[in-house]
């Protein structure tokens, strides 16, 4: 059983992992190079706790299971599970995994929070790569239950299954990707939506607010309970997906999308930055994060009542 977790890097994603693991009574050792980041991390833990408490029915925050260190060796040498959260950079991750592999226990699982890099390459210089994989979460990690588990070419199924059990023990819903591919699953879908949005803005058809509303008030409401395929299955009526493909399949030949990304010019960047600034209406990122977190807590609590009827 995995009891002690090491989180390497305390940025947005690393902080989320620390909070989720502490919430589920795991001993957590957080690593970062600057000791000053410890204070920042604790401040964020305390900000988030009211939302975590409400979602997971926890009484009070216990920091006795939390330790902050500035040595990778100290962070990983006694850990059962290591969750790496360094920037999306092959050279940096390869170097880091080499160090982690040297100091980690032989059977300690090493998972990268990478959102699109290939695990085989990330762990190319890591000792015992059979216990390595991707464990890609969604932001905010402390609330969102999804995590994509992506194996490398040398990953052993024993460790994949062990990682799956661990993520379930901290109230996550593991998505097992059959083999490695750039961007994994969710980010490839999000990237397609993002690129299409950039084209629409670049060509002057809509603002960032218009596009966000098109998702928020349309498919986004459904997607929190049912994904694209089940949603389209329902669109086919009584005959389901069979009729849907027959009815709407020809639309695949229509020029409805441009998946190749447009050039990110200064003009396009300005439109996007200006648009999102206007959408924020003067609210800080922290303030908007609080609103989002409160919404997600209530949404997830409500979803539990219905998802069991679909996913039995």
Predicted regions span which residues?
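Hydrophobic/aromatic residues located in beta-strands of well-ordered beta-sheets
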Residues: 28, 82, 110-111, 132
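NAD(P)-dependent Rossmann-like dehydrogenase/reductase catalytic/cofactor-binding core
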Residues: 2, 24, 172, 176-178, ...
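Active-site-proximal catalytic alpha-helix in oxidoreductases
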Residues: 16, 141-150, 170, 175, ...
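Rossmann-fold dinucleotide-binding core
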Residues: 112-179, 183, 187
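NAD(P)+-binding Rossmann beta1-loop-alpha1 motif at the extreme N-terminus of oxidoreductases
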Residues: 1-55
């Amino acid at each position: 059983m995995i009891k002690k977790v090491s989180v390497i890097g305390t940025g947005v994603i690393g902080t989320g992992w620390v909070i989720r693991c502490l919430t589920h009574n795991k001993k957590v050792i957080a690593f970062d190079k600057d000791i000053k980041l410890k204070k920042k991390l604790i401040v964020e833990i305390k900000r988030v706790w009211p939302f975590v408490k409400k979602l997971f029915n926890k009484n009070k925050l216990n920091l006795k299971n939390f330790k902050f260190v500035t040595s990778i060796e100290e962070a990983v040498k006694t850990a059962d599970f290591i969750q790496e959260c360094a920037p999306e950079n092959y050279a940096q991750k390869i170097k880091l995994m080499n160090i982690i592999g040297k100091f980690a226990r032989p059977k300690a699982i090493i998972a990268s929070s990478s959102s699109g890099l290939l695990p085989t390459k990330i762990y190319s210089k890591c000792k015992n790569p059979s216990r390595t994989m991707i464990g890609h979460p969604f932001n905010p990690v402390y609330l969102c239950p999804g995590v994509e588990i992506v194996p490398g070419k040398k990953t052993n199924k024993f460790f994949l299954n062990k990682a799956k059990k661990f993520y379930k023990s901290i109230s996550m819903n593991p998505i097992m990707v059959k083999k490695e591919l750039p961007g994994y699953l969710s980010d490839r879908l999000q990237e397609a939506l993002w690129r299409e949005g950039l084209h629409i803005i670049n060509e002057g058809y809509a603002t960032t607010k218009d596009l966000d509303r098109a998702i928020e008030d349309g498919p986004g409401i459904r997607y929190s309970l049912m994904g694209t395929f089940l949603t389209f299955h329902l669109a086919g009526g009584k005959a389901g997906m069979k009729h849907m493909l027959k009815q709407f399949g020809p639309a695949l030949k229509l020029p409805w999308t441009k998946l190749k990304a447009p050039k990110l010019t200064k003009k396009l960047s300005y439109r996007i930055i200006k648009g999102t600034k206007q959408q924020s209406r003067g609210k800080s990122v922290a303030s908007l994060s609080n609103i989002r977190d409160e919404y997600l807590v209530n949404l997830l609590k409500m979803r539990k009542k219905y998802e069991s009827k679909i996913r039995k």
